[in-house]
Amino acid sequence: MGMEDLYREVMDLNMMDDDDRKRDVAKAFFEKLNFMEIPEYFNWASEIFEGLHVKERGDKTAFIWADIVTTESKSYSYRDFSFHGNQCLNRLRKAGVEKGNNMYLMVPIVPETWFASYACIKGGLVSVPTATTMTQRELEFRFETYPPDALLADEIYTEVIDAA
């Protein structure tokens, strides 16, 4: 049984209306996982998000972002989300960012944050979410403890990042 089949089972399970049946099916499903052979390679972004969701429901809404302060909102289809995530990953790769690199994300919660997170998953990067409220001292400690290979930040944070 491949990973795509497992994800399809989970999606079917989540759509069940009968909670008692859902509980029984979930229990059997998780028992089966205990004996499953772990695949040597698996990339959720490529195999499941793109290989399953983009392929089968590309034009359907995958993501809705809303700003509670301004009431601005944006929605993205599976295809759009994948496009923006891949665009971000391609730019990172052109900049020399490679699989296994530590990528700090010091950005506000905007759609691009989600695209960058997707790019990290697909590209095998280690995503390091970083609070936008961090001080120079806190960043210095983090950078010494866990050095960044790449850093994605809103330009308003560049001064504190450069100082660290």
Where are these regions (language model features)?
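A short N-terminal helical cap/helix-turn-helix that marks the beginning
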Residues: 2-21, 39-64, 83
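Conserved AMP-binding/adenylate-forming core of the ANL superfamily
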Residues: 59-118, 135-140, 144
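Mixed-charge, low-complexity intrinsically disordered regions
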Residues: 18-19, 27-32
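Short, well-ordered amphipathic alpha-helices
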Residues: 47-49, 89-90, 158, 162
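Structural core segment of the AMP-binding/adenylate-forming
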Residues: 1-14, 118, 122-164
